[in-house]
Amino acid sequence: MERRALGPDGFEVPVVGMGTSRTFDVRGRAAEATSRRIVEEALDTGANLFDSSPMYGEAERVLGLALDGRRAEAIVATKVWTADDDLAERQIEASLHHAHGRVELYQVHNLVAWPARLDRLEQLRDEGLIDVIGATHYDAAAFAELMTVMRSGRIGFVQVPYNPLERDVERAVLPLAEELGLGVMLMRPFGRGSVLRRWPSPTELAPLEPFGVTTWAQALLKWGLSDPRCTLSIPATSRPGRMTENA
């Protein structure tokens, strides 16, 4: 698995990680066992970065269970997502618990109360509980504010959507990330599945085989990662075998 530096501090990440939105919001032993199998497959292929959030229901808890016994092999990314200071502390406490005591990449989710949240994340970084701070947003209407945060010098990376149907980041976010040396984590590489609805035929994919591409999902991941300004992509899946294919 190729690895790239996420931001100016040179923290290395795999070019393909895994998101947990929706797919890891599960309960019950059978569903949790499936999630563990998916995580183990990702670790075995080197796709050892897992992105979550308190916003994703049970995902942080389920991910933590799945990493039991292999936490040292993983890079955990999560977020804080609230305008309430007390709730933010409870979220952070729960996230650290589920992540076995530390979180490598901690993000302000959708820029909610970002000045105060960055203050707290910087404290956690100083305490050695996190490595790199980031910020996320899914909506192009918020990218101007995201760019303000990028220029603040307080974050090392951003997480934004990027796929053939969502290309707003090309206009200003990616150029600014390149200028500032910030990492870029790609959410929604498959457009929440919309880009996958029309699968090309094997004949159409054949020209991509020399590049290691045999599926449409692989082609979409390569599409985003072929831009050197993009550091990694985090597809989500609820199906065993998919992470092996994606990696």
Identify the role of each PLM range.
Residues L6, M18, A42, F50, ...:
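Conserved, mostly hydrophobic/aromatic
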Residues G28-A42, D84-H100, A116-R117, A140-V149, ...:
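Short, acidic/polar
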